[in-house]
């Protein structure tokens, strides 16, 4: 029996490129033995609802074509269910942090080749209160950049749009009093921002978590304590090289469970989208989602070789 694949795509991502190449994508998957259909989202939440429906119809593979927000919605549609289908990713967004982390090609046909080759690996996801995320959760004014950056600017200059908006916001940044409990430890004090990372790539910074593992069951917790503008600029420069972890104003820890609260009204960023406000409880769900990935990722330090799946190793 042929395997069934359902593509869930954002037709506006990537300058509408996927929408134009959809017929070729369907033909390519059909030739590879997949009975394939597609669904175009129209508004926020559509991808989650369609992923849930596809689960009920017992699709073998779900393919998310869009940015990190589309991928997040698809994950939220399947995360709570047993017997989850394998997940394919076609990166079509501005930054594509998750795709970068798994070395998935940015071109559509290359990403489809990864799915067709059939190698997959199980990765951690995060649960924040009652929703899920696959790449990061963060708080602080600077973390609002990804969902406050104008779409027109993103379409013109791509990932650099975030840096432009970020530097514009730097002078406005204020520290807030936070209480962060993580695996029996507590941080109580003023901080500019915090990150909970599941991969090595966040907002295009591919070395923000230089020792990231995608399947170890731990978040990487980064807290940037109250700093002046010069110190923060220095931290950002170091972060581009993966050298920020030893800065005296940076707390860098690993944790499975994290609780964050504040008396200040603080917005959250979840996989690049608005994620509500504090307080929030975070839990790492180890190796929860099975994702198609290039076979050579097994040689990367991102994957715990003790957990390597048989289908990620060449026969």
UniProtKB/Swiss-Prot annotation:
Pfam families: DAGK_cat, YegS_C. GO terms for molecular function: ATP binding; ATP-dependent diacylglycerol kinase activity; metal ion binding. SUPFAM superfamilies: NAD kinase/diacylglycerol kinase-like. Mg(2+) binds at residues 213, 216, 218. It comes from the Bacteria. GO terms for cellular component: plasma membrane. GO terms for biological process: phospholipid biosynthetic process. The active site is at residue 273. PROSITE patterns: DAGK. ATP binds at residues 10-14, 41, 67-73, 94. Its EC number is 2.7.1.107. Binds 1 Mg(2+) ion per subunit. This ion appears to have a structural role and is required for catalytic activity. Homodimer. Catalyzes the phosphorylation of diacylglycerol (DAG) into phosphatidic acid. Is a key enzyme involved in the production of lipoteichoic acid by reintroducing DAG formed from the breakdown of membrane phospholipids into the phosphatidylglycerol biosynthetic pathway. This is Diacylglycerol kinase. The lineage of its organism: Bacteria, Bacillati, Bacillota, Bacilli, Bacillales.
